[in-house]
From Swiss-Prot:
Residues 55-86 are annotated as: Coil 1A. SMART domains: Filament. GO terms for biological process: heterochromatin formation; nuclear envelope organization; nuclear migration; nuclear pore localization; post-embryonic digestive tract morphogenesis; protein localization to nuclear envelope. Disruption phenotype: Mutants exhibit mild dumpy phenotype and moderate defects in movement in adults. This is Intermediate filament protein ifc-2. Expressed in intestinal cells and at desmosomes in intestine and pharynx of the larva. Keywords: Coiled coil, Cytoplasm, Intermediate filament. GO terms for cellular component: cell junction; cytoplasm; desmosome; intermediate filament; nuclear envelope; nuclear lamina. Belongs to the intermediate filament family. Residues 400-550 are annotated as: Tail. Residues 238-255 are annotated as: Linker 12. Residues 87-99 are annotated as: Linker 1. It is found in: Cytoplasm.
Length: 622
């Protein structure tokens, strides 16, 4: 018993150590779990520790019971030995044997109780082991779920890291662009200041030029005035000269003119002599002053003054050259500014024309789209009007009355049960097909059958030996259908049929493909990540709500997806179907791990109005 107790105690201690190891290892896993998972893990760990403590207490109680049993067995052996001694020492029975028997019975009762408690404890241990296994399975499921979520979490973290990297890159680019904008603004401010300074200088030069122009105009006016006065005087003198045409008058005029010339020459010579004398006197006076100053002034000072005068002259010349160069530069700058202004005005006018052209093009596109919509609405309205006209004429309402008597009217319906009369009212919708036949159509009760064609119209059937006849209340149905068939079919055929496109080409990766489609919606591209549909029309918007994409490999369907919401594609717009791992990237996805773009794969497109007619397909040739 002691060996079993030691083995049991060591076993449960080992299990407690293992559970502690699991708990510590699981505690390390808690750091990467969510709050709910961490709470659940903590509760499981507390329950395991509580169970471990209870198992330890039960082991201690079992060991105590075993020790008590061993002690009682030892006492039993001692008492048995004493009983044997007493029995051998005394003859016959006495009261001592009764006492010993009572003690033995009491010890047996205690032993039985201990054995009964042991079985109870073993059952408790078995139940706790089952619960431990259940909790262990739950724990393993939780660990697997955590690992699966951790993989998704890693994928999300990678995507988040890429997005954050792109955001940081865009922010850095924005900062660089902002710095460039600030630098360009500073340069623009400097250029504007330089332009303002040049404009001010230009304004000053223009003002000076205007002033000089005014002075020149004044001088020209004075010259013109003097010239006019002189011309008037000459004209007056010429008048007198023309009057005096005699030789004496000419001689007199000549002598007077010569005398006047001599007087003018004498006056000029006198003035010249007087001016020359005055200049000579002034020159001599200046020479005398210079000589006197040269005697008084130091030659070094004279040299310095001469150098300063030369320097001043040089500076004046350099300034004059600088002014001339600046004037030339300003003239060139004015010409450049004029050219730039003209070019800017031309670009502005050209941009306005382009904007007007783009606006007109958009308006034309919108008008074309509206016109197409109006045409479609007109066609549908015509069809509806014709349909309502047919309904009003009563050409599609037929009432059948069945009885036990037969009458040949070209229309026969089988169906008499027990001599009763049935009235069948049937409404048929007119289609574009010329003859529509219905045969072997089961009725609502077993044994009834209707056969015939709508165009004739003959419907017949039998039940046992009873016959039936029917009468059409709307007149001759065949003629009514024939009368309106042409107009309805003409309205339906007026709608243009979808154009068939059969294209072969090379995609961006260099692979050859073969694409076939009806209308304007095509399968533009198939990659392992997505399938792309495109509206190839440049002016028309198309509704793709209800379109279904299906991909098959060697005739076996790999997967399918449908657009279950109204969706209108603008001209040249695309829509993509992603796989299940990329369902967060778009609105539509297919429940596949990846799309097959090999040569054995075929991608097809269907419309909800014609679910079995293939509207488009796409395959790779290599």
């Amino acid at each position: 018993m002691s060996t079993y107790a030691a083995y049991t105690t060591s076993t449960y201690q080992g299990r407690g150590l293992a559970s502690g190891t699991y708990a510590s290892g699981f505690g390390q896993l808690v750091s990467g779990m969510s709050s709910a998972g961490a709470i659940c893990t903590t509760q499981i760990r507390d329950a395991r520790e509580r169970e471990k403590r209870e198992i330890g207490l039960l082991n201690d109680r079992l060991a105590d019971y075993i020790e008590k049993v061993r002690f009682l067995e030892a006492q039993n052996r001692c008492l048995s030995h004493d009983i044997d001694i007493l029995r051998n020492g005394f003859s016959g029975g006495g009261h001592v044997s009764g006492l010993f028997d009572a003690e033995i019975n009491q010890a047996k009762h205690i032993l039985e109780q201990t054995t009964a408690h042991r079985s109870t404890f073993e059952r408790d241990i078995t139940g706790l082991s089952a619960e431990i296994e259940v909790f262990r399975k739950k724990w393993l499921d939780a660990v697997n779920a955590v690992k699966a979520h951790r993989e998704d979490h890693d994928v999300d973290l990678d995507r988040l890291a890429k997005i954050e990297a792109e955001i940081s890159l865009f922010k850095r680019k924005i900062r660089i662009v902002e710095e460039d904008v600030i630098r360009i603004r500073r340069e623009n401010d400097g250029i504007y200041n330089e332009i303002a300074r040049i404009k001010q200088l230009t304004h000053n030069e223009i003002a000076l030029k205007n002033e000089r122009s005014l002075n020149v105009s004044d001088l020209l006016q004075r010259i013109n005035l003097l010239q006019t006065e002189n011309n008037v005087r000459i004209e007056q003198e010429l008048v007198f000269i023309r009057r005096d045409t005699t030789a004496d008058n000419r001689d007199y005029f000549r002598h007077e003119l010569q005398a006047a010339i001599r007087d003018i020459r004498a006056d000029y010579e006198a003035i010249s002599i007087r001016n020359r004398q005055d200049i000579e006197v002034w020159y001599r006076e200046q020479i005398r002053k210079i000589q006197d100053e040269s005697v008084r002034v130091n030659p070094d000072l004279y040299k310095e003054e001469l150098i300063s005068i030369r320097t001043t002259v040089t500076n004046v010349r350099s300034r004059l050259a600088e002014v001339e160069g600046r004037n030339f530069f300003l003239e060139r700058l004015i010409d450049d500014l004029k050219n730039n202004e003209e070019a800017k005005f031309f670009e502005i006018s050209l941009a306005e024309r382009d904007a007007q052209i783009a606006t007109l093009r958009d308006q034309c596109t919108e008008l074309s789209i509206q016109m197409e919509k109006l045409c479609d609405n007109e066609i549908s309205l015509r069809a509806e009007i014709e349909r309502y006209r047919i309904l009003l004429n009563g050409a599609n309402v037929t009432t059948y009355t069945s009885n036990t008597h037969g009458s040949g009217s070209g229309i026969a319906v089988g169906g008499v049960v027990g001599g009763s009369t049935r009235v069948i009212s049937q409404t048929t919708r007119t289609h574009s097909s010329s003859n529509t036949s219905y045969s072997n159509v089961p009725a609502s009760r077993g044994g009834y059958s209707i056969s015939g064609n709508v165009g004739g119209i003959s419907v017949g059937g039998t039940i046992g030996s009873h016959g039936a006849s029917a009468h059409a209340t709307g007149g001759i149905i065949g003629s009514g259908v024939q009368a309106h068939r042409g107009s309805v079919s003409s309205l339906i055929t007026d709608k243009p049929r979808d154009r068939v496109h059969d294209e072969k080409g090379v995609d961006q990766s260099g692979r050859h493909f073969h694409s076939w489609y009806l209308g304007t919606i095509s399968i533009n591209q198939v990659t392992p990540s997505y399938i792309e549909l495109k509206n190839i029309c440049k002016i028309r918007r198309v509704d793709v709500g209800g379109f279904r994409i299906e991909q098959s490999v060697n005739g076996q369907v790999l997967g399918s997806a449908q657009i279950n919401v109204p969706l209108i594609l603008d001209p040249q717009e695309v829509v993509r179907f992603n796989h299940r791992h990329g369902k967060y990237l778009g609105q539509f996805f297919m429940d596949v791990d990846a799309f097959d773009n090999s040569t054995v794969a075929r991608t097809s497109m269907y419309n909800y109005t014609e679910p079995h007619e293939e509207r488009a397909w796409f395959v790779y040739l290599d």
